[in-house]
Each structure stands twice: as structure tokens, then as C-alpha cells.
UniProtKB/Swiss-Prot annotation:
GO terms for cellular component: membrane. Coiled coil: none annotated. It is a multi-pass membrane protein. The keyword Transmembrane helix applies. Belongs to the UPF0057 (PMP3) family. Keywords: Membrane, Transmembrane, Transmembrane helix. Its main location: membrane. PROSITE patterns: UPF0057. The chain crosses the membrane at residues 5-25, 37-57. This is UPF0057 membrane protein F47B7.1.
Length: 59
């Protein structure tokens, strides 16, 4: 199972800068970016979980 470079970058960004990871993954500023920014202001761990879900587990 090969991991692509973009996935590695998204994983690192999802941990340290969750809104940026969502922005890069979605290629636009959508509702998920706004939700994640709000989560970052209030709770950092849920923002990381949301970014990981959006980048890797969303169908």
C-alpha cells in the first residue's frame, strides 16, 4: 500500500493546521473550512479530528 506525497502532506497539515489541510484537500474554501476554523478557535482536538475525517475517511 503506497502512500502518496499529497496524503503525507495532508496528514501533517491535518495535525498542525487543520483548516489548511481541508482547504488543500477540497481545492476550495467550502463550508468544511469554515466549520474547522470555528472548531480551531474553540477546541483544537475536534478540529484535528474533523480534518482527518474530511481528508481521509469521508466517502
Amino acid at each position: 500500500m503506497a502512500i502518496e506525497m499529497q496524503q503525507i502532506i495532508e496528514l501533517i497539515l491535518a495535525i498542525f493546521l487543520p483548516p489548511l489541510a481541508i482547504f488543500i484537500h477540497g481545492n476550495d474554501c467550502n463550508m468544511h473550512v469554515a466549520v474547522n476554523i470555528i472548531l480551531c478557535f474553540f477546541f483544537f482536538v475536534p478540529a484535528v479530528i474533523h480534518a482527518l475525517w474530511y481528508c481521509f475517511f469521508r466517502a
